[in-house]
A protein has these predicted regions:
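H-loop/switch region of ABC-family ATPase nucleotide-binding domains
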Residues: 179-180
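ABC ATPase nucleotide-binding domains
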Residues: 210, 217-286
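Conserved ABC ATPase signature
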Residues: 118-122, 126
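Conserved catalytic motifs of ABC-family nucleotide-binding domains
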Residues: 139
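Catalytic Walker B motif of ABC-type/P-loop ATPase nucleotide-binding domains
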Residues: 143-147
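H-loop (His-switch) and adjacent beta-strand-loop-beta switch element
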Residues: 192-204
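Conserved ABC ATPase "signature" region
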Residues: 99-114
Length: 286
C-alpha cells in the first residue's frame, strides 16, 4: 500500500485537566472516504485541527505528504444578507480564477446556473455545492467536509453523497467527513470511525453499528435504529430536488425506510446537529 496522505500516531491532547484526545491513531490514503462520527464534545473537530496542523498535540506525531493540498468545506457559511456577493466573486475571493474556470468547477458540482446569483439567495444544497466548487479550484488531494449535509433535505443529501463519490473518483482525492449524524452515513464510505476522544471502533458502516463500543456510546436503541439500505434510481433529481429524467413518480411514499427498494439509493445513520457557523478555508501544508 502507498504511504498515507496524512497520518496521526498516538495523538494525545489535554485542555487543562480535560483529556480531549487520548492516544489517537488515524491514517488517510488517496482516494479513500473516511467518516468520523461521534457525539457533541467528542473531540472530532479538535482531532481534525490536529491532523491539519492547526492544533499542536501534547504527544504523538502527525505525518503529512509534502506539499499536501487540503480543501476544507464548513458546515455552513454565514454571509450577511445585505452584503452583495455573487457566486463568481465568492469563488475568487482568495484565489485567481477566470470565469471559464469557475464555470467548469460549478458544472462539476451541478451548480453552473448559479454563477451570477447572490450568495445570500442560495438554498442549503446550492451553498454546499458552491463551497465544494471553491475547493475544487485548489485541486485538493484531501477534502475535509464538516457536516456536509446539514441544512439539506433528504433528496439533496443523497445528491451530495453521489457528488462526493464522483469527486473522489474524478480527482482521486481522499475525503474526510465529520458527522454528528448517526443515522445517515454515506454507503460508499470506506471506513467509519466511531470517535469519543479515542477511536472506539472502525470499519465499514454495516459492521460498526454492531460493535459493542458503538452500541455503548450511542445506546442500544440508536444502534438498532440504524439501517443502511441501497436503492437504484430510474430517474435523476436536479439541485432543487425535482425529477429531471426517467420516472416522474415520487417514490418517497412508496416504501418503508427499513427495507430495500428497487428504485433508490440512500444511506441512513442518526443526527445531533451542531449549528455553529464556520468560515470556509483551504490550507496547503508542507
Amino acid at each position: 500500500m502507498t504511504a498515507p496522505l496524512i497520518e496521526g500516531r498516538g495523538l494525545t491532547l489535554s485542555f487543562g485537566s480535560e483529556r480531549v484526545l487520548d492516544q489517537v491513531s488515524l491514517s488517510i490514503h488517496a482516494g479513500e472516504i473516511i467518516t468520523l462520527i461521534g457525539p457533541n464534545g467528542a473531540g472530532k473537530s479538535t482531532l481534525v485541527k490536529t491532523l491539519l496542523g492547526l492544533q499542536k498535540p501534547d504527544a504523538g506525531d502527525v505525518l503529512r505528504k509534502s506539499g499536501l493540498r487540503i480543501g476544507y468545506v464548513p458546515q455552513k457559511l454565514a454571509i450577511d444578507q445585505v452584503l452583495p456577493m455573487t457566486v463568481k466573486r465568492f469563488l475568487t475571493l482568495t484565489q485567481r480564477a477566470s470565469r471559464p474556470e469557475c464555470e467548469k468547477v460549478l458544472d462539476q458540482v451541478g451548480a453552473a446556473h448559479v454563477i451570477d446569483a447572490q450568495m445570500s439567495s442560495l438554498s442549503g444544497g446550492e451553498s454546499q455545492r458552491v463551497m465544494l466548487a471553491r475547493t475544487l479550484l485548489l485541486r485538493p488531494e484531501l477534502l475535509v467536509l464538516d457536516e456536509p449535509t446539514q441544512g439539506v433535505d433528504v433528496t439533496g443529501q443523497a445528491g451530495l453523497y453521489r457528488l462526493i463519490d464522483d469527486i473522489r473518483h474524478e480527482h482521486n482525492c481522499a475525503v474526510l467527513m465529520i458527522s454528528h449524524d448517526l443515522h445517515l452515513v454515506m454507503a460508499k464510505t470506506d471506513q467509519v470511525v466511531c470517535f469519543n476522544r479515542h477511536v472506539c471502533c472502525s470499519g465499514i458502516p454495516e459492521t460498526v453499528r454492531q460493535h459493542p463500543e458503538y452500541r455503548s456510546l450511542f445506546g442500544l436503541q440508536e444502534a438498532d435504529a440504524i439501517g443502511i439500505y441501497t436503492h437504484e434510481h430510474d430517474h435523476e433529481h436536479d439541485i432543487s430536488g425535482h425529477v429531471v429524467g426517467g420516472c416522474g413518480h415520487d417514490h418517497s411514499h412508496d416504501h418503508d425506510h427499513g427495507h430495500s427498494h428497487a428504485h433508490h439509493k440512500h444511506d441512513h445513520h442518526t443526527h445531533t446537529r451542531n449549528d455553529a457557523a464556520s468560515q470556509q478555508e483551504a490550507v496547503t501544508r508542507k
